[in-house]
Amino acid sequence: HSLVLTLDANVQSVLETSLQTTMKDSKCESAWALVVEVETGKILGWGSYPSFDMNEHDITQYLNMASDNAYEPGSVMKGITYAAALDSGNYPYNQSFRAKTFNYTYDESTGKISRSSKKTVYPSISDALGRDFGTLTYDEGFIRSSNVGICCLLADYLPAATFEEYLERFGFLQSVDIPFVSNATGVKNFSHPSDILSTGFGQSSSVTALQ
């Protein structure tokens, strides 16, 4: 029987070199990446460092970072949140919000998060580095990578239950059906309203690069 891989030797070579360069330049402890063909989902490149050689007998690190390591993905998750709002019909076209800081209240009986004009018992959420972008449309909020825009989207337009459903539909927070490769499921953290909001911009909940 023949075994045919989707990996592209040229892509894999560039990926491996890039990971090594990233490790050296940033002095980080680990780095990992996947290159995926958008149209088909084929994995063209897969790598993680530190790596291991199966020919060695004193291996101390077997972790495949791209599939086994769950982490908070950061702002790349904002695209998923926006996509969920768009696909579910909840995207606020031509609406705007006030950026900089998001204060809010939470109704435990309904699960409703509401923006507040003043600080509450819940932790405030700000845009990166405390920047004040002023009033933005939601399109502009995406361009500016506004955390507050995500919070307003989740509070006013995209219900938490719908957001959670779309995370699962996108394949997050669950094992990926790929043969012969172990992979973590990630961790959904919707324990507090701040966690729901933070998940929208890539914090609190964790996923894997493979997902």
Across the structure, where does each feature detected by a protein language model lie?
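Short alpha-helical catalytic segment bearing the HExxH-like zincin motif
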Residues: S75
